Every structure is written in structure tokens, then in C-alpha cells.
Swiss-Prot record:
Outcome of gene disruption: Cells lacking this gene are unable to produce melanin in hyphae, resulting in albino mycelium, however there is no effect on growth or morphological development.
Protein name: 1,3,6,8-tetrahydroxynaphthalene synthase
Function in brief: Involved in the biosynthesis of melanin but also various secondary metabolites containing a naphthoquinone ring. Catalyzes the iterative condensation of five CoA-linked malonyl units to form a pentaketide intermediate. THNS subsequently catalyzes the dual intramolecular Claisen and aldol condensations of this linear intermediate to produce the fused ring of 1,3,6,8-tetrahydroxynaphthalene (THN).
GO MF term list: acyltransferase activity, transferring groups other than amino-acyl groups
One Pfam short name: Chal_sti_synt_N
Keywords, comma-separated and alphabetical: Acyltransferase, Melanin biosynthesis, Transferase
UniProt record, GO biological process: melanin biosynthetic process; polyketide biosynthetic process
Listed pathway(s): Pigment biosynthesis; melanin biosynthesis
Record-linked PANTHER family: 1,3,6,8-TETRAHYDROXYNAPHTHALENE SYNTHASE, HYDROXYMETHYLGLUTARYL-COA SYNTHASE
Catalytic activity: 5 malonyl-CoA + 5 H(+) = naphthalene-1,3,6,8-tetrol + 5 CO2 + 5 CoA + H2O
Subunit structure: Homodimer.
InterPro entries: Chalcone/stilbene_synt_C (IPR012328), Chalcone/stilbene_synt_N (IPR001099), Polyketide_synthase_type-III (IPR011141), Thiolase-like (IPR016039)
């Protein structure tokens, strides 16, 4: 059975605190008619620190889309190998044992995808399949896990490497002065992550079922306007209330699996902002403690897009992991409005090969019943 192993996380060395963010907002937007509202909204995020791929002075000085994308490519090639090596070590796998690389990022563009460079530069086989995901935004972390799960169900002896590279600060647009844009300037951070999904064995979350849901007629709630100056992030004021629509999706998937949300042991969800976590507590009738890892990611890193779920999961591992067979859920939320959800149980020690194959045969026989 496919197991999501311990993620590797990296953040850039340049740090900006909430106080520095507030001071910059006061100075930069001194005459803005809604400046005080923006300052309150930034404070309410609870984001205390964020990491940036460039010093704040370079981040604020927009050099143009071409230069920014060059920075994206150079920094990705500099920083990705280290998290890939650590993720492989965490899963006790070698590059030659990886059959698919899923690369997720919504903050820069490359063609060919960085997957080609990773394969050529880090000892992966030329036959390694590539799956770049560029347009699912913050939902892409959950989507990557689910597509890796699907692949391992189809090819039970395979291993999948997931890589997330998000330099959100490269999307800063000084001319965007709407309340939503100014709030985003104090919310998003930069990070990289990688994790291996093993088809057999491994310690971590055994992936048992996954599902996807698109909220109808909400595609303009979270979007990019692509202009000469790059990606302009657009956030509708209705976005903070989306958990009222998505919480039932989580409940339904868990119920379909024969489990009950109140009896589950851990939750790793995309912490796009504090309202998401607060509303999930309310609509799922769960105590705030159940989302402590996602909350810590938001507080210490900000919204790091598709890397959020991996950073939060790494915190669960750092805390000793969960008990054997503990029941858990991972969910990513993003543009669409899209939810990508996975449920599974914790494996303290890797399953034996024979047992794993038996479970995989059960998955293939059951089809939807086990894989979403």
C-alpha cells in the first residue's frame, strides 16, 4: 500500500517579521484610505515570520517579469536538490528507484519543467515519468499526494517523488493596492519541500482513499491576472468563507471510507489563513488542537502555497509521528475553488512486502472503494 514518507522542508535565509511587514505597509501605503483596515487584517493572520528568496529591498523593487522568472529558475535549481536528497534519505530510496516525479509550483514558469533538470542532474533514470502541476495553486500539494497515490495503485511496486517549490515573494506587485492584494503581501512566504510516496513499505501515512471536489462557479474567487509585469494574484472577499462549502466534502469522504471525523487522530490541512482553520474547527466540530501543525506552519512560515501540507506533515513527524494505525486526513485547498483530500492510517514501521502486495491487490479489486 502506498505510504507518504517524511517530507523534507527548506526555507530561504531572508526573514521578515510581522512587525517589519506592518512598518513597511504603514510607510509604503501612508495615504491609502483603507490602510488601517489592512494593518488589522495582517495582524489577524497571526503570521509572525516569513522567509523570502531575496532580501526585502530586492523583493519590493520590481525588475520585470523576465528577470523575476530568471530568479525563479536559478533559485529553484540551487535549492531543490537539497530537499530532494533529504526526502529520498527519509524514505530510504535512491534516485534509481523513483518511477515518477511530480513537481508542483505556481510562482514561476519553466519549459521544460524542472522535472527534466532534476532527472538529468541528480541521477534519476531517463525512463522516469514527469508530472508538472502549475495551475492548482495552494491545492497542488494535496493534488500531488493524490496523483502519487493513484500512480502507486496502478503500479504497486513504484515509488513517486513529489517536489514543491514556491517563491511567492516573486509575485509581489507594487501597483496592486486593493485590500486583498495588500493582505496577501503580509500573508505569503517562500518555501521548498519534497516527499516520497513508496508503493511498498515505508514509515508515514498509508494512503487509502482520495478525492477531489470543485465548488461550482467559483473559478474567479482565486486567480492570476497574467500581465506584462507577471502574475497578479487576485483574491475575492468571499474566499475566507469557503470552508462552509468544503467541510461537508471532507465529512463525506471520511464517511465513505467507513470512518468518523470525531474519531480521527490527525489532520494536516492547507492553512491559507486563520479563518480556514477556525472554520474547520467549527464545521467539523473539532478542537483547535487538531490543527496545531497547520497553525504552526501558518504562524512561522506564512502561507507557503503547495508546500503548506508538507511543512505541517513534517511537524507531525518531528512530534514523533502518530500511533500505529492512527487515522488521519490531508487536505489542500486552492483555486477553482478546489479541494484535494486524502485519508489514510499511520504506519510506524514499513509493511512487509508480501502484506503490502496483498493490500494493493485489495485496492485494485475494490477500485473506488479504496482509492477515491
Amino acid at each position: 500500500m502506498a505510504t507518504l514518507c517524511r517530507p523534507a522542508i527548506a526555507v530561504p535565509e531572508h526573514v521578515i517579521t510581522m512587525q517589519q511587514t506592518l512598518d513597511l505597509a504603514r510607510e509604503t501605503h501612508a495615504g491609502h484610505p483603507q490602510r488601517d483596515l489592512v494593518l488589522r487584517l495582517i495582524q489577524n493572520t497571526g503570521v509572525q515570520t516569513r522567509h523570502l528568496v531575496q532580501p526585502i529591498e530586492k523583493t519590493l523593487a520590481h525588475p520585470g517579469f523576465e528577470v523575476r522568472n530568471q530568479v525563479y529558475e536559478a533559485e529553484a535549481k540551487t535549492r531543490v536538490p537539497e530537499v530532494v536528497r533529504r526526502a529520498l534519505a527519509n524514505a530510504e530510496t535512491e534516485p534509481s528507484e523513483i518511477d515518477l516525479i511530480v513537481y508542483v509550483s505556481c510562482t514561476g514558469f519553466m519549459m521544460p519543467s524542472l522535472t527534466a533538470w532534476i532527472i538529468n542532474s541528480m541521477g534519476f533514470r531517463p525512463e522516469t515519468r514527469q508530472l508538472p502541476i502549475a495551475q492548482l495553486g495552494c491545492a497542488a500539494g494535496g493534488a500531488a499526494i493524490n496523483r502519487a497515490h493513484d500512480f502507486c495503485v496502478a503500479y504497486p511496486d513504484s515509488n513517486v517523488l513529489i517536489v514543491s517549490c514556491e517563491f511567492c515573494s516573486l509575485c509581489y506587485q507594487p501597483t496592486d493596492i486593493g485590500v486583498g492584494s495588500l493582505l496577501s503581501n503580509g500573508l505569503f512566504g517562500d518555501a521548498l519541500s519534497a516527499a516520497v510516496v513508496r508503493g511498498q513499505g515505508g514509515t508515514g501515512m498509508r494512503l487509502e482513499r482520495n478525492g477531489s471536489h470543485l465548488v461550482p462557479d467559483t473559478e474567479d474567487w482565486i486567480s492570476y491576472a497574467v500581465r506584462d509585469t507577471g502574475f497578479h494574484f487576485q483574491l475575492d472577499k468571499r474566499v475566507p468563507g469557503t470552508m462552509e462549502m468544503l467541510a461537508p466534502v471532507l465529512l463525506d469522504l471520511v464517511d465513505l471510507h467507513g470512518w468518523s471525523v470525531p474519531n480521527m487522530d490527525f489532520f494536516i490541512v492547507h492553512a491559507g489563513g486563520p479563518r480556514i482553520l477556525d472554520d474547520l474547527c467549527h464545521f467539523l466540530d473539532l478542537p483547535p488542537e487538531m490543527f496545531r501543525y497547520s497553525r504552526a506552519t501558518l504562524t512561522e512560515r506564512g502561507n507557503i502555497a503547495s508546500s503548506v501540507v508538507f511543512d505541517a506533515l513534517a511537524r507531525l513527524f518531528d512530534d514523533g509521528g502518530a500511533a500505529e494505525s492512527a487515522q488521519g486526513l490531508i487536505a489542500g485547498f486552492g483555486p477553482g475553488i478546489t479541494a484535494e483530500v486524502a485519508v489514510g492510517s499511520w504506519a510506524k514501521e514499513g509493511l512487509g512486502a508480501d502484506v503490502g502486495r496483498d493490500l494493493d491487490e485489495l485496492e485494485l479489486t475494490a477500485g473506488v472503494a479504496l482509492s477515491g
